[in-house]
Swiss-Prot record:
Function, as annotated: The UvrABC repair system catalyzes the recognition and processing of DNA lesions. A damage recognition complex composed of 2 UvrA and 2 UvrB subunits scans DNA for abnormalities. Upon binding of the UvrA(2)B(2) complex to a putative damaged site, the DNA wraps around one UvrB monomer. DNA wrap is dependent on ATP binding by UvrB and probably causes local melting of the DNA helix, facilitating insertion of UvrB beta-hairpin between the DNA strands. Then UvrB probes one DNA strand for the presence of a lesion.
Main subcellular localisation: cytoplasm
One BP term from GO: SOS response
Localization terms from the record: Cytoplasm
Name of the protein this chain belongs to: UvrABC system protein B
CDD domains, A to Z: DEXHc_UvrB, SF2_C_UvrB
Source organism phylogeny: Bacteria, Bacillati, Cyanobacteriota, Cyanophyceae, Synechococcales
Any one GO cellular component localisation term in the record: cytoplasm
The UniProt record lists the keyword Mitochondrion: no
Species in which this protein is naturally found: Prochlorococcus marinus (strain NATL2A)
Pfam families registered for this protein in UniProt: Helicase_C, ResIII, UVR, UvrB, UvrB_inter
Secretion signal, residue range per the UniProt entry: none
């Protein structure tokens, strides 16, 4: 059993010990599904950390977006500094999938931009899963997409040991077949070089170089080396060099795949010609023959993923192998905000197939392209051995699967109660709202107001602004970095009120918010359903004076259930506080300098700031990230910042300003260490 060393400045409190005991017992008893029904701010992540530590299982923590994944990864790295906590999200900075619009006869080619830093983290995750047992991978939904064949990936790895006799030419051929490229001038990730009796490799999973010093045919020493200074960082007895890409296809399998593609093409052309689809048949034949020539000559073609079924030797309709298949047999799945994440799992396959069907029907792709896909819902659950759903408002499906294995956690370690809930009539609601906002703002507290439509949110924002209220409006067209910036400005007191349609129902903590206002609470629908109301009310659950105002003229079933559940939790919390003599105290961290530095980063990334600005931003982030990881957004921003700094460094080196280039190089090194958790 792997040993997890949980490090925390506090011990489980409230109903955390009972929740931990219940979940650990369920895992040890082999329960397939459990649910942690934890109210906002009760320390669900700490409970999960204890569960992982006590069961000793490799764990996959699934979040529904990369911001929450970054937040969870940061928190778990704090709890497990000596264990492997990896971050696995989509490596695309930009992705436009291949598509065809029949109505306008428009073909859209696939275009994408891969973030090399995130690709490194993905390789780091799979490497840890092969080499360690104490591994926690925090992933987004991208983990259900194909990721090569684990057995082939492992088989293709090249192992070096001190004292081992090797044939250097054979090793170099192995590296090339594993998609490393030789570059004796500039070495980086995915490259290698040979200088005399020294072989240096930039492994796909690390920002450090691996140096092998040879004496004749014998490996004399192996060491990690700083890629810019050449300084030896530490010596090794042995090392595995894994392929530069997760998709590894041996020569014999490639030959078999080409034959299978030719056969499928022949069958498909016969079908299209019989159907009288001559244009589609000609289009498909031209594209596929060109792709086959490319595969035969260079082993690669544009859109090679569409032939994934043939290249991996899978049967038609069979499930692709993904990140889950890199885990050992005895692993644990933890799904955060399961009421959002589980529907995502179901939606991914259907959306992908709808787009592929159009491409196949119109002769752009062979039918086998449909098998380059994410996992189906049933395939995912067949691979998952034991699952814990985590949510303040679990969905009906999660609850039905867990049946009796539902563990509740409603008591906050801080003693803060769920907010009071008041229902007020809509007549005169705007003036009443204005009064409540001024009252809270005078105490330096923050307010969230949620409306049903964008137009209503805009009009309300304008009205509040005219009445001298410091207010901002959040809507769906705001990009993620600016969205985080607006949220943190709220925390920092740049303004007092945030108005929006679907405001932060899950995830980010806002301990400064004491008032949540829900307009048109009696309009039944997705945004005013029971779970949505509970999640929105929960945004005020971290403040001692938390209050939720629902403006409505009638009591809907959803409102009644949400209010009843909030009052039930509040009563449990109050009784516990009285019995244990607990006085509620403010929850959460204050927005700190690490957040401020992130805001500077996001602003500078949207304009081409000076080199000094970027160095200053990097210095602030390095200084504060060591002390405070806050909400995890800094982790999410690092790949983009590193790319900017590298671009600046190359420009300075080209201009012969080596002093500034060296300063930038040092900052990049420190930021990369922060990114991989070292």
């Amino acid at each position: 059993m792997p040993e997890y060393k949980l490090q925390a400045p506090y011990t489980p409190k409230g109903d955390q010990p009972a929740a931990i005991k219940g979940l650990v017992g369920g895992v040890n008893d082999g329960e397939k599904f459990q649910t942690l029904l934890g109210a906002t701010g009760t320390g669900k992540t700490f409970t999960i950390a204890n569960l992982i530590a006590q069961t000793g299982r490799p764990a996959l923590v699934l979040a529904h977006n990369k911001t929450l994944a970054a937040q969870l990864c940061n928190e778990l790295r704090e709890f497990f500094p000596d264990n492997a906590v990896e971050y696995f999200i989509s490596y695309y900075d930009y992705y436009q999938p291949e598509a065809y619009v029949p109505v306008s006869d428009t073909y859209i080619a696939k275009t994408s931009s891969i973030n090399e830093e995130i690709d490194m983290l993905r390789h780091s995750a799979t490497r840890s899963l092969f080499e360690r047992d104490d591994v926690i991978v925090v992933a987004s939904i991208s983990c259900i997409y194909g990721l090569g064949i684990p057995s082939e990936y492992l088989k293709a790895s090249v192992k070096f040991q001190v004292g081992q006799s090797i044939d250097l030419r054979s090793c170099l051929r192995s590296l090339v077949s594993n998609q490393y490229t030789r570059n004796d001038i500039e070495i980086s990730r995915g490259r290698f070089r040979v200088r005399g009796d020294v072989l240096e490799i930039g492994p796909a999973y690390d920002d450090r170089l691996v140096r092998l010093e040879l004496f004749g045919d014998e490996v004399e020493s192996i060491s990690y080396v700083d890629p810019t200074t050449g300084e030896i960082l530490n010596k090794l007895d042995s090392i595995n060099i894994y392929p530069a890409k997760h998709f590894v296809t041996p020569k014999d399998r490639l030959d078999s795949a080409i034959k299978a593609i030719k056969k499928e093409l022949k069958d498909r052309l016969e079908f299209l010609n019989q159907e009288g689809k001559l244009l589609e048949a000609q289009r498909l034949e031209q594209r596929t023959i060109y792709d086959l020539e490319m595969l035969k000559e260079v082993g690669y073609c544009n859109g090679v993923e569409n032939y994934a079924r043939h290249l991996s030797g899978r049967e038609p309709g069979s499930a692709p192998e993904c990140l889950i298949d890199y885990f050992p047999k005895d692993w644990l799945l933890l799904i955060d905000e399961s009421h959002v994440t589980c529907p995502q799992l179901r939606a991914m396959y259907n959306g992908d197939q709808a787009r592929k069907k159009v491409l196949i029907d119109h002769g752009f792709r062979l039918p086998s392209a449909a098998d380059n896909r994410p996992l189906k819902d049933i395939e995912f659950w067949n691979k998952a051995k034991q699952t814990v759903f985590i949510s303040a408002t679990p969905g009906d499906w999660e609850l039905s699967q867990s049946t009796k294995n539902i563990v509740e956690q409603v008591i906050r370690p801080t003693g803060v109660l769920d907010p009071l809930v008041e229902v007020r009539p809509t007549h005169g609601q705007v003036d009443d709202l204005l009064f409540e906002i001024r009252k809270r703002a005078s105490k330096n507290q923050r307010i969230l107001v949620t409306t049903l439509t964008k137009r209503m949110a805009e009009d309300l924002t304008d009205y509040l602004s005219e009445n001298k209220i410091r207010v901002r409006y959040l809507h769906s067209e705001i990009h993620s970095i600016e969205r985080i910036e607006i949220i943190q400005d709220l925390r920092l007191g740049e303004y007092d009120v945030l108005v929006g349609v679907n405001l932060l129902r899950e995830g980010l903590d806002l301990p400064e918010v004491s008032l949540v206002v829900i307009l048109d609470a009696d309009k039944e629908g997705f945004l005013r359903a029971q779970r949505s109301l509970i999640q929105t009310i929960g945004r005020a659950a971290r403040h001692v004076e938390g209050l939720a105002l629902l403006y409505a003229d009638k009591m809907t079933d959803s409102m009644a259930k949400a209010i009843s559940e909030t009052e039930r939790r509040r009563e449990i919390q109050n009784i516990y506080n009285i019995e244990h003599g607990i006085t509620p105290k403010p929850a959460g961290k204050k927005a700190s300098n690490s957040i401020l530095s992130f805001l500077e980063i996001s602003r500078r990334l949207n304009q081409d700031g000076s080199t000094d600005d970027f160095v200053d931003i990097a210095d602030k982030l390095i200084e504060h990230s060591a002390k405070d990881s806050d909400s995890g957004v800094s982790l999410e921003s690092l790949p983009e910042l590193i790319e900017k700094l590298e671009s600046k460094m190359k420009i300075k080196a080209k201009d012969l300003d080596f002093e500034t280039a060296a300063i930038l190089r040092d900052r990049i090194k420190k930021l990369r260490h922060r990114l991989v958790g070292r």
